[in-house]
Amino acid sequence: MNKSDSFYNLETIGGILLFIAAVLAIITANSPYRVGYEYFLSINGSVSVGNMSITKPLLLWINDGLMAIYFLLIGLEIKREVNRGILSDKTNLLVPALTALAGLLFPALIFIFFNAHHPVYLKGWAIPTATDIAFTLGIVSLLGSRVPFSLKILLTAIAIFDDIAAIVIIALFYTEQLSLLSLSLALVFTLILIGLNYFKCRRISVFMLFGVALWIAVLKSGVHATLAGIVIAMTIPDEGKESMLTRLEDGLHHWVVFLILPLFAFANAGVSFVGLDASMLTHPVVLGIGLGLFLGKQLGIFLSLGYFVQFKKFLKADKVNLAQVYGIALICGVGFTMSLFIGSLAYQNYDLSLMPMVKIGVVFGSFIAGLTGFLVLKMTSLKR
């Protein structure tokens, strides 16, 4: 089995585990164990080094700590793809880049349409712009050879650009009041990591030591701590198939797929339907997220990618048709992990009472988009 097959098989398993974790979270949040579930996530954990101490509830350790490892993996994957993968052919970058951009703009505009008159609600405009690569590849893999491999590659490229956009959005729009001292320390640790690469240090443990120091500095700076993962990834040496980047990526991938993302899903997807009524389903935040994911994503991606397929003969050799493109566009509306993550950033300092609305919108929008996308691809794609 080559690395590409291994990647897609692992992402398929990851999608299934995410689904199971999300379902368990929803069941638990609507059972007599709901109080225990909420208490478990609120338990404080502390880490002390000398005179410095970091104390956070378990939920934030997952969202700020473990998700930094997830972003480290995303950064490694992006760097690898730019150096020698999907994104290395500059002539093929335009289609997934423009498609991802259109898939970002339309959901954001739909969210803004429903929430333009609510300044606090409006802070969640980026929630429906995300695509969950694990879930989307998991859904597509269930269809087997009905979906051309070239479309799976393209879906991955779109998701990578989507992740890049999410990183930029988090850095620009979801950053708190900044601490210049902590930012200065973060810069120092970043320069040290760059120096380690330049002077050909090839010990992962040394990079991780200064990487943890960078994470702490970023955490204290007001910039979201997960971005430290991206910075670390960009400094990791990549000199071919057996490089440190490859070894670190391979080592992290299983931890992310089998532990970090399912744990994140279980901690964040616990939507309680107790007391749910029609007024909650028509809440501007729910409508903006749900319709942004289901309607906005499919419009943006189908119009953009459909144009390239129909008029520019993109993927002509693979006999990709517009029906398949539409199915892929629908599946890209599965925002789940990243949408929930951005939602937690958007309202954490303004109105936490909106988080149930975020979860309802993300769960319903992602579920409908994923189900309809699966059905469209199943009905319209020929068995190959």
Curated annotation (Swiss-Prot):
**Keyword vocabulary terms for this entry:** Antiport, Cell inner membrane, Cell membrane, Ion transport, Membrane, Sodium, Sodium transport, Transmembrane, Transmembrane helix, Transport
> Which reaction is this enzyme known to catalyze?
Na(+)(in) + 2 H(+)(out) = Na(+)(out) + 2 H(+)(in)
According to its UniProt entry, the function of this protein is described as:
Na(+)/H(+) antiporter that extrudes sodium in exchange for external protons.
Gene Ontology cellular component terms for the protein in this record: plasma membrane
Source species of the chain? Legionella pneumophila (strain Corby)
Residues crossing the lipid bilayer are 7-27, 58-78, 94-114, 124-144, 153-173, 179-199, 204-224, 256-276, 285-305, 325-345, 357-377
Q: Which Gene3D superfamilies match?
A: Na+/H+ antiporter like domain (1.20.1530.10)
**Which Gene Ontology biological process is one annotated for this entry?**
regulation of pH
Q: What is this protein called?
A: Na(+)/H(+) antiporter NhaA
**Statement: the UniProt record of this protein carries the keyword Ion transport:** yes
Q: Which gene encodes it?
A: nhaA
Give the protein family. Answer: Belongs to the NhaA Na(+)/H(+) (TC 2.A.33) antiporter family.
List localization entries.
Cell inner membrane
Q: How does it sit in the membrane?
A: Multi-pass membrane protein
Q: Which GO terms describe its molecular function?
A: sodium:proton antiporter activity
